[in-house]
Amino acid sequence: MTLEALSSNGLLNFLLSETLSPTPFKSLVDLEPLPENDVIISKNTISEISNQEPPPQRQPPATNRGKKRRRRKPRVCKNEEEAENQRMTHIAVERNRRRQMNQHLSVLRSLMPQPFAHKGDQASIVGGAIDFIKELEHKLLSLEAQKHHNAKLNQSVTSSTSQDSNGEQENPHQPSSLSLSQFFLHSYDPSQENRNGSTSSVKTPMEDLEVTLIETHANIRILSRRRGFRWSTLATTKPPQLSKLVASLQSLSLSILHLSVTTLDNYAIYSISAKVEESCQLSSVDDIAGAVHHMLSIIEEEPFCCSSMSELPFDFSLNHSNVTHSL
């Protein structure tokens, strides 16, 4: 008991002495010397470190990023090579197309006469080729008609030597009408409407008429006897047939774009390209063919004493109902 009491008293004295001692207690950690490279961290430094944002997670190491780049490099280079090859292929195809187009245009220009190819640009060459083809078409019609005319004339001279002079004068004109009429494709009945086709033809004893309509562009071909084709007739007070026809078409809101005439003996082929204006009341092929047929009928039947276009005994401003009923 005595030993226990002494030990307890000694422990109490030790605690009291340590509590009342002016020098603080130093732990074993405090007593150890600090290394030179260590940095003493203050409370402010700890608070700053705690307030900083944490580093982004899942950040791959540099070695992994390098490996991915090495994997993607061949694929990126392959795509660039394909794009470059495709671009070069397109350039080569376009260059080849332009070269072929220039060759064709140069050949086309060399085949045309000088009046039809006065400029070297593409639009002028193509437009000149169109005009030249139209001129060749009219020349072909004239030559075919002349050929049949000469053949029929030779047959009539060799087969019969006892024909009357009147018959010999009428025969040369009949082959022209037959040979020229073969270029007008379709027969047309004015009492019936051709709703399915885009081409109609009117055939009467005095003329053959063919009309083709493509959207707002109309092509009109007329085979008719010429009136006023001699200088003596042109000098008279009666205007020519062509001027009347042009005036009548313009009065129907058909703007003339191109007009050409091919003649043989006293027959003429009028090839007219016209634009159908918005104010035109003739909306179909049959309407245009009927109106032109009506005009030519009135021109053929009009008296010879008319001295000007204002004195013509008919009105050119025909509407759709008048044209239909007049036929």
Curated annotation (Swiss-Prot):
<keyword id="KW-0539">Nucleus</keyword>
<dbReference type="Pfam" id="PF00010">
    <property type="entry name" value="HLH"/>
</dbReference>
<feature type="domain" description="bHLH">
    <location>
        <begin position="85"/>
        <end position="136"/>
    </location>
</feature>
<comment type="function">
    <text>Transcription factor. May be involved in the differentiation of stomatal guard cells.</text>
</comment>
<dbReference type="InterPro" id="IPR036638">
    <property type="entry name" value="HLH_DNA-bd_sf"/>
</dbReference>
<protein>
    <recommendedName>
        <fullName>Transcription factor bHLH71</fullName>
    </recommendedName>
</protein>
<comment type="subunit">
    <text>Homodimer. Interacts with FAMA.</text>
</comment>
<feature type="compositionally biased region" description="Polar residues">
    <location>
        <begin position="152"/>
        <end position="169"/>
    </location>
</feature>
<dbReference type="GO" id="GO:0006355">
    <property type="term" value="P:regulation of DNA-templated transcription"/>
</dbReference>
<keyword id="KW-0805">Transcription regulation</keyword>
<dbReference type="InterPro" id="IPR011598">
    <property type="entry name" value="bHLH_dom"/>
</dbReference>
<keyword id="KW-0804">Transcription</keyword>
<dbReference type="GO" id="GO:0003677">
    <property type="term" value="F:DNA binding"/>
</dbReference>
<keyword id="KW-0217">Developmental protein</keyword>
<keyword id="KW-0238">DNA-binding</keyword>
<feature type="compositionally biased region" description="Basic and acidic residues">
    <location>
        <begin position="77"/>
        <end position="88"/>
    </location>
</feature>
<feature type="region of interest" description="Disordered">
    <location>
        <begin position="151"/>
        <end position="176"/>
    </location>
</feature>
<dbReference type="GO" id="GO:0005634">
    <property type="term" value="C:nucleus"/>
</dbReference>
<feature type="compositionally biased region" description="Basic residues">
    <location>
        <begin position="65"/>
        <end position="76"/>
    </location>
</feature>
<dbReference type="GO" id="GO:0046983">
    <property type="term" value="F:protein dimerization activity"/>
</dbReference>
<feature type="region of interest" description="Disordered">
    <location>
        <begin position="46"/>
        <end position="88"/>
    </location>
</feature>
<dbReference type="GO" id="GO:0003700">
    <property type="term" value="F:DNA-binding transcription factor activity"/>
</dbReference>
